[in-house]
């Protein structure tokens, strides 16, 4: 399928149809309607890799319940919450842009991709309870989290999330809750934005088209594109290329030969979910519940029990369970992806990952070899009365974590999102994972400001951007002025009303 026949020369080429390409394309076209933008997707459907709703947590990562963003205590013994505040601010920008897209008719029926679901942190055992209490004290000191509730009362937790306490032995427990959390189907959102983009003058998207090579040319880049269904090879020239191809980004950057990729590697981590679609169980859990990471687990494997709304139906997902893999893409990948990504400039980086992260490697192997009974034991840490017959195991996609040199030391695994941009600002790519999707608008704003300085520096574009994302350029992390706090809350309520997350 194609949105139209496409153009020989474009201003912007987007590789991959996930949430990053979708939001960047929509943002740039909104700021400059004259831009010619073309998108290429290797699979036969839009947003079916990491952005697909079944392949990610869909938490609307806002730092509310994800304890992995606040793992440390300061010298005073208090839990440090700065990272959670930063992520919440970034997700606010994301919601504001999506709300703008709804108001402008770019996307319809926001309930198809975003719904309000309470975000809960749940812990057990005295040490964990003390940690959560300190975290709550730090979080509620900021206006973002003023409404966060805390309890150690089992009966209150039973009212919030009954599955967590039924059948649980007598031990200290605690939970925090914010009603204003969200569940996001990033795949559905991406499809809506890309279909809108494809209807605009000078724009197109192509499915079943693999970008096989990137070569510099006088005015930017020449893309070699293989039409997988028709068997033909296309050439496209683009002034700017964004590689938002998930696990496919690193190999394309390597083919482009940009010096900035030297020393980077990719470390793929597979994932799986336990899924329950039994109506009587699903109906009793209306929350996203996060716990603490077990030992060497990467942040993407922090356990959580989530209420999800996917493809028009509700389900419970527990996990994810991490697994060792050498594939970079879930559907379009090959087991040769990791070996073929090893180059003279990054082999030492990858070797040091193996040596310096032996607990992580061992954890991934152990996770991949788990039996169903072992997985159910982990689930019962959250839901003690869980029955094997009510759950099935599905794949949860693949995250390729960025590996790079840092402070002269190679082999650092970055559980986050890395934006790599060439020195001439003609190509930019996204590496890494969580919390990428949720803070996608903040990330694509970074790309736009870095690579389109003339556009973003213009008066008209700045005014448009201010209307789209009112908090852009305003420091909300350290806000203390009552007037600023009240204005922020008005903007936030307006976005939530447009997205159907609160009553107008």
Stretches found by the model and what they are:
Residues 13-15, 40, 211, 236-248, ...:
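Short hydrophobic core segments
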Residues 29-53:
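Glycine-rich FAD pyrophosphate-binding loop
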Residues 243-259:
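Flavin (primarily FAD) binding-site architecture
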Residues 58-159, 315, 327, 335-336:
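Dinucleotide-binding Rossmann-like beta1-alpha1 core, especially the glycine-rich loop
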Residues 108-117, 122-200, 204-206, 214-219, ...:
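Flavin (FAD/FMN) cofactor-binding and adjacent substrate-gating region
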Residues 82, 86-95, 123-130, 176-198, ...:
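Short beta-strand to alpha-helix junction loop
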Residues 8-10, 229-240:
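Core beta-strand elements of the Rossmann-like FAD/NAD(P) dinucleotide-binding domain
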Residues 171-180, 188, 328-457:
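C-terminal catalytic lobe of FAD-dependent flavoproteins
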């Amino acid at each position: 399928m194609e949105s139209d026949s496409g153009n020989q020369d474009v201003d912007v080429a987007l590789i991959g149809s996930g949430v990053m390409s979708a939001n960047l394309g929509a943002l740039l076209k909104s700021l400059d309607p004259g831009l010619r933008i073309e998108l290429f997707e290797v699979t036969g459907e839009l947003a079916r890799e990491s952005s697909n709703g079944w392949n990610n947590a869909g938490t609307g990562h806002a730092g509310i319940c994800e304890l992995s963003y606040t793992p440390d205590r300061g010298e005073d013994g208090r839990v440090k919450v700065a990272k959670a505040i930063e992520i919440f601010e970034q997700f606010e920008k994301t919601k504001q842009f999506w709300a703008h897209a709804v108001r402008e008719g770019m996307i319809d029926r926001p309930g198809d991709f975003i719904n309000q679901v309470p975000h809960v942190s749940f812990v057990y055992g005295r040490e964990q309870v003390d940690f959560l209490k300190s975290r709550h004290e730090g979080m509620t000191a900021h206006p973002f989290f003023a409404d966060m509730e805390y309890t150690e009362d089992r009966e209150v937790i039973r009212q919030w999330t009954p599955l967590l306490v039924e059948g649980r032995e007598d031990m200290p427990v605690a939970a925090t809750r914010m009603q204003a959390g969200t569940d996001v189907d990033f795949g559905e959102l991406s499809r809506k934005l890309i279909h809108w983009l494809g209807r605009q003058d000078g724009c197109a998207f192509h499915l079943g088209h693999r970008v096989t090579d990137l070569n510099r040319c006088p005015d930017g880049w020449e893309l070699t594109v293989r039409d997988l269904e028709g068997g033909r090879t296309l050439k496209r020239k683009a002034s700017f290329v964004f590689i938002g191809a998930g696990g496919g980004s690193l190999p394309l950057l390597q083919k482009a030969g940009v010096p900035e990729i030297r020393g980077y590697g990719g470390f793929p981590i597979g994932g799986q979910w336990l899924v329950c679609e039994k109506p009587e169980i699903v109906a009793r859990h209306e929350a996203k519940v996060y716990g603490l990471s077990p030992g060497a687990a990467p942040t993407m494997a922090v356990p959580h029990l989530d209420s999800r709304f996917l493809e028009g139906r509700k389900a419970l997902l527990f996990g994810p369970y991490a697994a060792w893999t050498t594939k970079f893409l879930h559907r379009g990948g090959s087991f040769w992806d990791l070996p073929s990504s090893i180059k003279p400039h990054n082999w030492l980086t990858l070797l040091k990952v193996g040596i310096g992260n032996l607990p992580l490697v061992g954890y991934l192997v152990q996770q991949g070899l788990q039996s169903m009974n072992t997985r159910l034991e982990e689930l019962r840490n959250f839901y003690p009365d869980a029955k094997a017959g009510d759950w099935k195991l599905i794949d949860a996609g693949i995250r390729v974590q960025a590996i790079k040199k840092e402070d002269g030391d190679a082999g650092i695994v970055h559980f986050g999102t890395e934006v790599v941009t060439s020195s001439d600002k003609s190509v930019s790519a996204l590496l890494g994972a969580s919390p990428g999707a949720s803070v996608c608008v903040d990330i694509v704003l970074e790309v736009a400001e870095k690579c389109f300085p003339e556009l973003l520096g213009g008066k008209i574009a700045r005014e448009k951007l201010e209307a789209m994302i009112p908090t852009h350029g305003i420091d909300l992390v350290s806000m203390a002025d009552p007037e600023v706090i009240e204005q922020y809350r008005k903007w936030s309520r307006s976005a939530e009303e447009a997205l159907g997350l609160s009553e107008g």
